[in-house]
Amino acid sequence: MAYQGTGNHSPPGYDDGGHRLQDLPAGNNYEEEASRGLLSSQTGPFTGPFDDPQQRNLSPARPTSGYSLTETYAADAGYHDPYSAGGSVYSAQSGENPATAFGVPGRVASPYARSETSSTEAWRQRQAPGGAGSGGGGGLRRYATRKVKLVQGSVLSVDYPVPSAIQNAIQAKYRNDLEGGSEEFTHMRYTAATCDPNEFTLHNGYNLRPAMYNRHTELLIAITYYNEDKTLTARTLHGVMQNIRDIVNLKKSEFWNKGGPAWQKIVVCLVFDGIDPCDKDVLDVLATVGIYQDGVMKRDVDGKETVAHIFEYTTQLSVTPNQQLIRPTDDGPSTLPPVQMMFCLKQKNSKKINSHRWLFNAFGRILNPEVCILLDAGTKPGHKSLLALWEAFYNDKDLGGACGEIHAMLGKGWRNLINPLVAAQNFEYKISNILDKPLESSFGYVSVLPGAFSAYRFRAIMGRPLEQYFHGDHTLSKQLGKKGIEGMNIFKKNMFLAEDRILCFELVAKAGSKWHLSYVKASKGETDVPEGAAEFISQRRRWLNGSFAAGIYSLMHFGRMYKSGHNIIRMFFLHIQMLYNTFSTILTWFSLASYWLTTSVIMDLVGTPSASNGHTGFPFGKTATPIVNTIVKYAYLGFLLLQFILALGNRPKGSRFSYLASFVVFGIIQLYVVVDALYLVVRAFSGSAPMDFDTTHGVGAFLGSFFGSTGAGIIIIALAATFGLYFVASFMYMDPWHMFTSFPQYMAVQSSYINILNVYAFSNWHDVSWGTKGSDKADALPSAKTTKEGGKETVIEEIDKPQADIDSQFEATVKRALTPYVAPVEKDEKSLDDSYKSFRTRLVTFWIFSNALMAVCITSDGVDKFGFTNSATDRTSRFFQALLWSNAVVALFRFIGACWFLGKTGVMCCFARR
């Protein structure tokens, strides 16, 4: 299908009625017309199931465009566009000069032609007024201008016409159903917010489209973004669009189908944390669906810096993670409904808490939603997951917050599980969702609702919960003083690294309220996990330090629960949970020693010949096994010491090999210990070892001997608490596959969680990663200067582009957006500072380990196994004898030198010239 003009012989304007959707008849007369369709020559990832050459009446030899807008931009016969090349549209695979394809024939290539490279520099150039590839010619076009009145004389809010292809992609039943004069589907609204989020109010002249249309917002879906690529962003955004379609398609809903269409009760808000870190390819994707346009942002308004750029549009378009464009084709259940979208692009990078302040304090207070769902870019919500989250709030009036199940992205055919780190994280996520989250949900207090996939009732978090939460926003540090981030001690700063835990505690402990938190198993989200050791360590540093500090905070302030409105039963279980959390914190604190002692004890039980094991050693015999165990123990302690050396002075990315080697060594040791433990179990049940159970004096005596056992009983308990409990719980939840695909890898990596991650986290407790990055990309944006019209109204002059130019620029944008994503190759080159630190680390490591090796060889009885003929006592005695003689020789040597110098100077003094 292609869009045809209507036959008007005047240039298309903003309210152009042309480009209506029509079926093209078969025949070669329309071959050239079809070839001029948007991206019609693309193949590969652009080809989709809706594009059948037979259905489209195109030649089978001609590659067809999948999931693309097939808008033609050919002008009518009576209208000549002086900037039209007259040829076919510049396609994704053609070798044409873009200056010729989009500009005046014969004109040299414009610097804006580099927009096709999707580089940051090209994006900067497109921000110039009229410079978004306008016509593609060399030099800027001169456009007519229009005067835009500022709201209350200070707020710049402008409506910009969207490309014809986007307008026409909206189904007619929605376009024709709006009130007269509505520009919801024809214009994108841009607002330059020059204020703090707390001042983004109706009183100050700011407003949002859903409120302007008097719509009730039931569900506000927020996507926070930092620097993710367009594949990750499209994965989240397209998943949200599909979930909204699931809600709109509900047939027998008591709520969504009353009081207006369901899609009008849902708003999607994207909050980007700064222009500088933002991937500019993502902006092309957003422009393709209509929620962003190049060249409209203003750096400041009359010298007052813009804090956030806010775009609003209602669209039916979506881009998949494979860069395929989805548009409405019929009224079937697979068609996406209109989605009210807001895009907030913060001018400077000011961290995630500030993004949430824009969401809750600025947009939330105007829209007043019932439920807010928080997603991170890269998290893909599963089928009907957002509906399941909302239903939890709808069915429980006291539910203040909820989260779904987050699982690791495993790739096609679960191929990511080949990486042991990914498999270990997959198992960790699964067990957390099977054991930890349901337990905490039963108590009513889930200690952490992951910021990547969670939901809150808006009125539940209003007040103190958000006030405490926003103390971590460094942009409020001057206003808050000592209560702000700059006035906090290092413990509180670490606490705000796990800001979602703070919000959870404050919500449950809210005075006079009885809000509780819950886990919704039916809601699932998929997220990518770190695949490299360096990235994994850096991520867990923030998680571990933040969660530990927040956990201590919740225990210390548990008394605030008594001011809440929870009933006595809930309070009883909250006390039980507090005791459980206290016990878990103590176990975590001593986990470093616990792992070492467990490793050492199991190896001694199995490898040291004694009467209990029949004077044998497993697995290498009674002679070799003690030697191997001694080597393993010293390797364990040596690499544990290495972790402190690395953590106190190196970046993980600067010590990739050292950390990778540490993971491998600890993994091998852990697997060796697991084999030893299984050997103990086999011996206990095979009769090779005596069973110290009382089976002759009744059940009570048996239980007493079982739980008091120091042999087989304790082994069985440990076995049941790990292998057995995990297997049983996983099968009960009918989700056991991780036990077969990820459990072995998790067992290998488990000790590294303590010996590497915890050591690095605690060694870098001082690193709270606050502060902002410099933002120089905003310099490319133009300023807005106001004038007084008639001495009264404040206006600005804004470029008034013809619709034909908007459409031609859009075609270049779509081509960039739908270009297959190629992941950049990350450079592992060390910086000069990293190389200096690496040398220091090697020097200190060699110094410490060489000294430790000598001390061990002299004093330890364990090295007797290596064939030393004398005992440790004899070696120590001889070492001290050698040391004393060495010091005596050195002292004597120094004394001889001093005497020689004294005698020489005395003699020479007699012969010196006067």
Curated annotation (Swiss-Prot):
Keywords: Cell membrane, Cell wall biogenesis/degradation, Glycosyltransferase, Membrane, Transferase, Transmembrane, Transmembrane helix. Residues 130-140 have a biased composition (Gly residues). GO terms for biological process: cell wall organization; chitin biosynthetic process. The keyword Cell wall biogenesis/degradation applies. It is found in: Cell membrane. GO terms for molecular function: chitin synthase activity. InterPro entries: Chitin_synth, Chitin_synth_fun, Chitin_synth_N, Nucleotide-diphossugar_trans. Its main location: membrane. It is a multi-pass membrane protein. It catalyses: [(1->4)-N-acetyl-beta-D-glucosaminyl](n) + UDP-N-acetyl-alpha-D-glucosamine = [(1->4)-N-acetyl-beta-D-glucosaminyl](n+1) + UDP + H(+). The keyword Transferase applies. Pfam families: Chitin_synth_1, Chitin_synth_1N. Residues 1-67, 112-140 are annotated as: Disordered. Its EC number is 2.4.1.16. GO terms for cellular component: cell septum; plasma membrane. Disruption phenotype: Reduces drastically spore production. Leads to resistance to AFP, a small, basic and cysteine-rich peptide that exerts extremely potent antifungal activity by inhibitiing cell wall chitin biosynthesis. It is an enzyme of class 2 (transferase). Belongs to the chitin synthase family. Class III subfamily. Polymerizes chitin, a structural polymer of the cell wall and septum, by transferring the sugar moiety of UDP-GlcNAc to the non-reducing end of the growing chitin polymer. Plays an important role in septal growth or maintenance. Mediates colony spore formation. This is Chitin synthase B. The lineage of its organism: Eukaryota, Fungi, Dikarya, Ascomycota, Pezizomycotina.
